[in-house]
Amino acid sequence: LRFVRGLIDSADLPLNVSREMIQESPIFTAIQKGVTSRILSELGKLAASAPEAYAKIWDNFGAVLKEGIYEDFERRDALLALSRFKTTASVNDWRSLKDYAASLKESQTAIYYIAGDNIARLEVSPHLEGFRARGVEVLLLADPIDSFWVSSGASFDGKPFKSITHGSADLALIPLLDTNSKPSCEIDQSVTAFLSFIKAELGDAVSDVRASDRLMDSAVCLIAPESGPDRQLEKLLAGAGRLKAAAKPVLEVNPHHSLIKALASLGDDDHSFKQDVAHLLLDEARILDGDRPENPRKFGDRLAHVLRRSLLSARV
């Protein structure tokens, strides 16, 4: 609550106050706890009685309040109740976790979120496709502190927070809104073989290559492995010099995408072409994730090779 300024009148305070006294005095500790609890209580009343006025406070100081979720375990539940979020259900207006809980799907076991640098980029992330297709609301988190408090074991209404860019999607039990658009559960044998080819070609650039159940329209995306941190948290830790070695990402491939099926149908004569495509798919996933190709020169050469091949095929 460092954005709050005020005066406190107490007969128990000595006239001479030192920094050591502020840090060690039980009186100051009691005052701090009492004032903090009172302010949070008043904010809760304001949020309930005048949501528009509270929204203005959240616009200006929401990121600071969320620091308390990470640092103040005692008041975590109160701060979560006060928190407001942009979501896939409401990009223009703030939503509370109580609102989110009311829209949970029957088989939904977690509060899903995606973290990044800005809301506009998060809105178009391919990771959202499978969740949107099922009507599952996802929190859009764009403040740096978000990546830390969601990974600190916080939960709301008995539901943990789960990143949609980390590990498995857990969407199998939630039905699609449009049952006619449901892809086949079976994956073509040629696609399975192509995924194995991609994994072998990319080597240690990725930890795994696997079929995705979170992609609907996009061909590929990058996922953080179960054993590592969320993708955005990893970027923040690396930028602050607090990450010794980044975990190798998982490349998820949409096995029902027309491009993937077409590439999987290519014969052995197209080996070098398929090698270039495997690396281009990884670079595409990096770009969609907000990163750059690891080697821009090789990316350009491979792209030129694939485009030339496409033009020659079109003339035949």
Residue positions per predicted region:
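Conserved GHKL (Bergerat-fold) ATPase module
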Residues: 1-316
